[in-house]
């Protein structure tokens, strides 16, 4: 047994022991520490496999298992799980103190993380599906343990309903592939009719796409993530949706090959929709965690753009371009895992101190919580794609891959690549717009309520993880080639050219980017501005003049005011609603209440009609529950007759 295999086994055992210790009286902090250490060891094992480019354990089998193993792709996702989950579990040591059901939440969190590990190391359909279901149920348990409010229960109900939808597709695809022997014989599926391959591809896209949060199957995500404890939100958004993408990568690039021709265009269309619509809906949100959840939809769309571009480039015979697009998708998978978990953890710290995440009630937190605020600023720059942070590197590579696809991808690739590149460019601009708003409302400006003014920095166990994640975002952004090298070997189309992996990222025929030089330039400009400001001296303070009114935080920019121009321009798409209620005392206006919202059109036009139809059908089916023994015996006899008839037809 190899060293990496031993490290993986020891890590899983230590994490399991940590789950048990978490529920022991006064064992919460020790249990979470053991969980974090064990998960970190599994990540080390995954990194060893990626660097060594050699798998350990079993290969995928068509049997009923259980079998486990790690190849470089699994190793990459193991390392990513550890980089997100270890800081989240350390953060939970401070976050869960004083909360109700803290030991049970800690145990559910540990089970959740181990289920993520289990999915990526599973090497048979049954083990994969068992871990998949455990991964789906564990966060729901943690959410309900943290809160039993009506909104939380409704969010969990939507999440579990979407999980069932995803499960149907995943179970159908996995069990059918095992039945056909496609896990061991990669040519077995090629002999099947096109209809069978199309049905399996559709099941995989629906199943894994729903769990990943691709539009239009994303409705659970902006409900469940804000309802979860912040360390669970960090792992859900940081890694659970990425594990769904892991399953999609296995399906599209390995098990279902060769794919039907419609798969790549459909995936690219869903990805472009997720990018643009995700960031638009994020801009319209007033609650921080819900805003971050919609940005998860956006970034999953960016990853899916890279995967779709890889498929289209491979179909056009451009294998080097396909390798670049695949590597860009994997790099953004890692980058989003880091900066999104960072942002959710910072949001949890803000909520712990202030008691709300309403953007219009925050402000000035950079002064009262400087460490968390600085880390949040770093995460905001990363998710907005601002250099020198990691989000820019992967988005730049994805954009270059799409531009190259538009130039060299053949008739289909040219049109689709151009549309996708335009969608990504628009998404990047809107993301910057969104986080200018977020940073201004959350970190800067005056305190909007007394709780913000009285807030202070959280404990070391909560600041340490966010500083660590912010450092990773900066490090990968400055030297992305160090990470891109091992990631490049994950591509099924061969490694990236060596010229693309140095200090300067080079895309042959497209462009180059020197992140270290950009970082040095930004640092130099910052120092120069500080020196110039110091030499200029400070301005004399003067009272604010606002036409005789007393200065008040309500006069500052609001979340809705910041995006009003965009709402007006896109009103035909967003369909904003506004109500104004005026309370009169005789002829004197006593109060004016203004309410506005941007409805979620996917819910109103797609899911609510489906739900209403299902409920109507359920009411009809309830009529069969008559309470009559004779009726139930009749149902049994009819069912038995149908089964026997089907069996008879099958035998003949």
List PLM regions with ranges.
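Transmembrane helix-loop-helix hairpins at membrane boundaries of multipass inner-membrane proteins
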Residues: 1-10, 16-107, 182-191, 484, ...
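Alpha-helical transmembrane segments
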Residues: 17-22, 89-90, 438, 523-533, ...
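Hydrophobic alpha-helical membrane-insertion segments
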Residues: 36-48, 166-172, 376-388, 465-484, ...
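Membrane-interfacial helical/loop segments at transmembrane boundaries in membrane proteins
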Residues: 58-62, 187-188, 397-411, 482-507
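Hydrophobic alpha-helical transmembrane segments
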Residues: 70-82, 197-208, 412-428, 502-524
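Hydrophobic transmembrane alpha-helices and their helix-loop junctions in integral membrane proteins
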Residues: 87-98, 103, 107-128, 138-458, ...
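Aromatic-capped, Gly/Pro-kinked transmembrane alpha-helices
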Residues: 483-513, 531-652
């Amino acid at each position: 047994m190899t060293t990496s295999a031993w490290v993986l086994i020891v890590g899983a055992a230590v994490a399991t022991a940590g789950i048990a210790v978490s529920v022991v009286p006064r064992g919460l902090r020790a249990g979470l520490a053991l969980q974090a250490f064990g998960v970190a060891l599994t990540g080390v094992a995954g990194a060893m496999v990626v660097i060594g480019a050699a798998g350990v354990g079993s290969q995928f089998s068509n049997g009923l298992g259980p079998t486990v193993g790690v190849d470089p792709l699994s190793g990459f996702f193991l390392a990513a799980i550890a980089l997100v989950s270890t800081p989240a579990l350390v953060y939970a040591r401070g976050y869960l103190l004083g909360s109700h059901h803290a030991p049970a939440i800690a145990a559910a969190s540990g089970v959740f993380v181990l289920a993520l590990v289990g999915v990526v190391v599973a090497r048979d359909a049954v083990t994969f599906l068992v871990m998949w279901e455990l991964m789906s149920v564990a966060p729901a348990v943690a959410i309900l343990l943290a809160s039993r409010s009506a909104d939380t229960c409704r969010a969990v109900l939507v999440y579990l309903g979407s999980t069932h939808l995803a499960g149907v597709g995943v179970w159908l695809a996995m069990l059918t592939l095992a039945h056909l022997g496609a896990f061991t014989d990669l040519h077995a599926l090629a002999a099947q009719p096109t209809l069978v391959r199309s049905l399996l591809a559709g099941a995989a896209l629906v199943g894994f796409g729903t769990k990943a949060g691709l539009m239009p199957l994303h409705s659970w995500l902006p409900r469940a993530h804000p309802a979860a404890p912040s360390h669970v939100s960090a792992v859900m958004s940081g890694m659970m949706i990425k594990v769904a993408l892991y399953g999609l990568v296995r399906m599209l690039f390995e098990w279902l090959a060769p794919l039907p021709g419609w798969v790549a265009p459909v995936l690219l269309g869903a990805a472009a929709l997720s990018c643009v619509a995700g960031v638009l809906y994020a801009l319209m949100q007033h609650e921080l965690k819900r805003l971050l959840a919609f940005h998860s939809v956006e970034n999953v769309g960016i990853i899916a753009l890279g995967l779709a571009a890889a498929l289209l480039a491979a179909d056009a015979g451009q294998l080097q371009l396909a390798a670049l697009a695949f590597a860009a998708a994997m790099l953004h998978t890692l980058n989003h895992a880091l900066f999104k978990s960072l942002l959710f953890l910072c949001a949890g710290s803000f909520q712990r101190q202030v008691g709300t995440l309403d953007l219009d009630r925050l402000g000035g937190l950079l002064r009262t919580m400087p460490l968390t605020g600085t880390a949040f600023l770093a995460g905001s720059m990363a998710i907005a794609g601002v250099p020198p942070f990691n989000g820019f590197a992967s988005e730049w590579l994805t954009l270059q891959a799409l531009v190259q696809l538009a130039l060299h991808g053949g008739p289909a690739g040219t049109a689709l690549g151009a549309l996708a590149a335009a969608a990504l460019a628009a998404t990047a601009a809107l993301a910057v717009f969104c986080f200018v708003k977020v940073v201004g409302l959350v970190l800067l400006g005056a305190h909007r309520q007394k709780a913000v003014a009285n807030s202070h920095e959280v404990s070391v166990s909560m600041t340490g993880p966010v500083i660590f994640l912010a450092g990773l975002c900066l490090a990968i952004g400055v030297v992305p080639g160090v990470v891109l090298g091992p990631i490049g070997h994950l591509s099924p189309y061969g490694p990236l050219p060596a010229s693309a992996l140095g200090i300067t990222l080079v895309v042959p025929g497209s462009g180059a980017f020197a992140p270290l030089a950009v970082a040095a330039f930004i640092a130099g400009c910052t120092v120069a501005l500080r020196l110039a400001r110091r030499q200029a001296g400070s301005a004399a303070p003067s009272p604010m003049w606002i036409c005789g009114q007393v200065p008040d935080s309500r006069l500052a920019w609001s979340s809705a005011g910041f995006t009003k121009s965009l709402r007006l321009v896109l009103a035909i798409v967003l369909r904003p609603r506004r109500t104004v209620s005026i309370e009169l005392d005789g002829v004197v206006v006593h109060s004016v209440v203004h309410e506005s919202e941007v409805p979620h059109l996917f819910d109103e036009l797609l899911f609510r009609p489906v739900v209403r139809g299902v409920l109507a059908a359920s009411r009809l089916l309830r009529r069969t529950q008559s309470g009559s023994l004779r009726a139930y015996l009749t149902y049994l006899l009819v069912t038995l007759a149908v089964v026997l008839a089907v069996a008879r037809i099958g035998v003949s």
